[in-house]
Amino acid sequence: MEYKLEQHRHGLTVANDHNFKKDFEEFLDVITSITDQDIIDEFNKKTNTRSNSNRVLTKSISDAINKLIDERLTQKAWSRQSRIFGDRRFKDMRWTLDFAKQTNGIGTFCVEVVFNNAGSLGWNLLKPVLACEQNHVEKAIETKIGIIVLATKEMKVAGGFDNTVATFDDAPLYLSAMSNIISATPIVIIGLCAPKSFKIEHYEANYGNGRRKKAGRIVMI
């Protein structure tokens, strides 16, 4: 996949520092290693499965991209669903990071892949702050730089994403409004570009038992 980059609090400058550059390039390599065909294959794999004798259909390529990123990052020793706090009161999913990286026992990057409702973007942007800055609650991991992955507007349309999904283009506005809160944490914002060889077309699908619902299918371009 191709991508765009933005930064908050000199995120790109810090990410390219010699202490962090290797891990940052490793993350970007994972993104660029994902091809259109990889996404098509993963999308079709899920579409062709069945649950309780009904087809499992999906509307967008978000699940396919999430799975491909997960598989390739974990192969490179990035931790998935990494807890921010060690305190057991904060053990549920809302207090975890999508991914985190430690090198030589030191946390470097924390990652949120954001394909959900724009109303949740503020919380997704705050998680790196919790992971990177000092807190009176015991930390399970402490990182230095946040990475936020979003779809660009073009990817949102071509990939069949819901109209309410936050985009790369929304992030600067949120970060500007939250600048007094996200005041010190360096953050890199990555916008995933639309596939070049296909798009998702929505249609009314039969889910079985008379149920019809919008689903997506691959259309080559």
Question: What are these regions, as identified by a protein language model?
Answer:
Residues M1-D87, I221:
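Interdomain/boundary linker segments immediately adjacent to catalytic/signaling cores
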